[in-house]
Amino acid sequence: MSKREYQVCSNCVMDTSDSKIVFDEKGMCDHCHNFYENIKPNWNPEGNPEELQKLIDKIKKDGQGKKYDCLIGLSGGVDSSYVAYCAVKKWGLRPLIFAVDTCWNLEVADKNIEKIIKKLGVDVHYEKINHDEMMDLQLAFFKSQVPYQDTPQDHNIFAALYNFAAKNGFKHILTGGNYSTECVREP
């Protein structure tokens, strides 16, 4: 196997320390191409109030006669916490909060979840991932030395959220994410 020549992107600081990075003929990396082609065209920091209001109205209409309008995945981090706050305080939605105990939760995240639930006056459903199965999966990832060691945990969180939604008839799921600080490379 030949060693790759060191190269830095002509547009950012990414380099060949990322073994999967690809450069075009001008030296721009695929991370930058992904940003300019997929993220930037859909990234609107100012928001689109009309579209947001249409979505809120649809969620409320679909939730008529039900205890909850939507399901919100809450990690206790900034993004999902802000979504929960907006859903209740700004948009007047009636969410059920969905939190996952992955066996690796930080104490601060768990405390944040409790504070948010209490302050917003919302119900919560806790899903506990099987500890032994999670440890076996993560040990297999460590031993195989694959990148993205968080894959078992991340996939379990979203699988639990979407399975719960499907089993319980939730039509709308709100999650928090941030294109500006997450997912430089999608797994």
Question: Predicted segment positions?
Answer:
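ATP-dependent adenylation/nucleotidyltransferase module used to activate substrates
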Residues: 2-187
